[in-house]
A protein has these predicted regions:
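Predominantly the C-terminal beta-signal and adjacent terminal strand-loop region
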Residues: 10, 14, 187, 192-249
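Short loop/turn motifs that connect adjacent beta-strands in outer-membrane beta-barrel proteins
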Residues: 36-55, 92, 108-120, 200-204, ...
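Short glycine/proline- and aromatic-enriched beta-strand/turn motifs that initiate or cap beta-hairpins
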Residues: 1-40, 245-247
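Residue-level signature of outer-membrane beta-barrel architecture
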Residues: 33-35, 104-106, 196-198, 246
Length: 249
């Protein structure tokens, strides 16, 4: 079992903005199963030694993470209609991932299992199938409809309205021809990670993992404005998780 904070790098907020990076953080959990080639299950003994068996494992897992998303940065802080609409625009995405990674341990898996050392660092690469369910609302309307019209409080005309979606987000390939899409979708993710195991006992380890998931879609967060310099990559996450691993006989 693994769990930890997820930093979602999306189209909400501003690239390389500290407030964005620290603000759009969710939480993820996962259930993990390992294929350990160093052992044979039928005899509960070591398998025939090969370099692959002693240095590689396959990790299969199911992950689920949720992140609430806000627009941070200088534009959202502007005291005008655009800034107001950005601050009022709230997002949320729920993501389910299923996939596998190949883990490489530079040190011997057998020696670590036998207690020769406490730490076993590793690197991994893999792929996940991803199902995502985003949402988007505005606090400027009682019904929260992000596709509706809102009053402009920065004019003297009480009937002056504009779209809840700001310019730059209001044209795209999403719902109603905008850069917002709250429909359920699916995609793939390429994953990389670095981490280490810490031996707690003969049959248990503590695992610390730093993970990057790069999605092959830019709609995972439900927001995909027209291509421009600030929208040059797809959505991705950085996930720091801690897990408990128990060895099954």
């Amino acid at each position: 079992v693994i769990a930890g904070p997820v930093a979602f790098q999306s189209d909400y907020g501003e690239r390389s903005n500290i407030e964005t990076n620290l603000g759009n953080v969710g939480f993820g959990v996962g259930i993990v199963h390992y294929l350990n080639f160093a052992y044979q299950a039928d005899c509960n003994c070591y398998a025939k030694y090969t370099y692959f068996n002693d240095h590689f494992k396959v990790r299969n897992e199911i992950d689920f993470h949720i992140t609430n998303l806000d627009n941070f940065g200088p534009e959202a802080s502007d005291n005008d209609f655009g800034g107001l609409r950005l601050r009022a625009h709230k997002g949320r995405t729920q993501v389910l991932e299923i996939g596998s990674q190949l883990e490489y341990f530079p040190m011997s898996i057998r020696d670590f299992s036998a207690g020769a050392y406490k730490f076993a660092p590793y690197v991994s690469v893999g792929a996940h199938f991803v199902s995502f369910n985003p949402s988007a609302t505005t606090s400027l309307r009682e019904d929260g409809n992000i596709f509706g019209q809102v009053l402009n409080p920065f004019t003297t005309d009480p009937t002056d309205t504009g779209p809840a979606i700001i310019e730059g987000f209001n044209v795209g390939e999403g719902q109603m021809g905008t850069g917002i899409d709250t429909r359920v979708g699916d995609t793939w993710a390429i994953t990389w990670s670095v981490g280490t195991r810490y031996k707690l006992g003969i049959l248990s380890d503590l695992n610390i993992d730093l993970r990057w998931h790069y999605y092959t879609s830019n709609w995972v967060d439900g927001l995909n404005p027209d291509p421009r310099p600030v929208n040059r990559v797809n959505d991705w996450i950085f996930w720091m998780n801690v897990g408990y691993i128990y060895y099954l006989d």
